Amino acid sequence: MEQLLSHSLLENKLALRQLFGQSVDFYTKDIQICGLACCICMFEGLSSIERLWVMLLDTASREPLDVTGPEQLYEYLLKGSAVPLEPRPVTCLSEAQTYLTAGTTLLLIDGVDRGLVMSTQSMQFRSVSEPTGEGNLRGSREGFTELLRINFSLIRRLVRSDSLRIETFTAGQRTATEIGLCYDARLCPPRLLRRLRARLSDLPLPVVLDSGYLTPFLGRGGFSFFSGIGSTERPDRAAAKICEGKAVILVNGSPFALVVPWLFYENFQSMDDYSAKAYFASFIRLLKYAAFFIAVLLPGAFVCAVGYTPELLPPELLYKVAAAEKATPLPLFLETLVVNFLLEIVREAGLRLPKQVGHSVSLVAALIIGDAAIQAGL
């Protein structure tokens, strides 16, 4: 059962202190408004004390406050005041916790069993910058940030349509992370929207810190080598997918948006395809397909050719392979597996290590691979 706020200001302050466990960043200040005892509560770093004081003092100096009791003061601040802080009522501690951790300020008045939250958010966030994982030659240089509302504005600025819809959900019993669902009401299939709403409303996760946490719960289920959910950190690409009838899911704290559904061929698309001529974009896409199938099939095809149909190989290459087989104790199949395994290790090291060390590892690996290719006659 939810704990309701009390008429006693002291009891409400003690309940909030107990709720947040005497956290040092939880700020409370006793003030007097029209001779009535009040208290403001906020989290340092999430709310702006300066903005709150400027707005309240400016309004108090401009407006005559003619109130005689706590209920009158509460109703005046809620409905009659010109304070531009979007005041909203709060009746229980769980609501107060949700609003406070979102960066708002809670105003408590002695003698009133309700609180008043005001929009004083002042969170520090990374500015909009160029995405590092999705480069392009032409087009926008903007990337998503970690703040959900900023990401909403980036999409809304690109898709200025009356059919663009943005819905929010809350996931994670411990983190209470806000999730945004963006779609075009005229283009997105209703069946897809019903499925996404049902799954986002009932996520069995105690913690949600990134959009990747949602991926296993949004797919159709069953085994598949390729995911049916894509990701992007570019607002223009997310806007393009929305205009194609897909849904985009954003998570507060993550610069990566999820795109549902995601088809296999979309892994080979880029934003440059939209700004290039059709035949040139198709040619580049065919090159990507060819590179993918070569990387996947060539090692196995080479092992099969050497082991079962060596007459398909050029004699010079066959002689070098035979000489290399004599010098190594492992069969060609195991050699190929070891090489692929080492390549994955080098790739992970280049990605996860600090940039200074990762670049050095990648350079050394490239030199070793190049030297091995020359010695093999390739």
Please tell me what each predicted stretch does.
Residues I249, F256, W262-L378:
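Transmembrane alpha-helical segments that form the functional core of multipass membrane systems
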Residues M1-L297, E311-P315:
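Membrane-embedded alpha-helical signal segments
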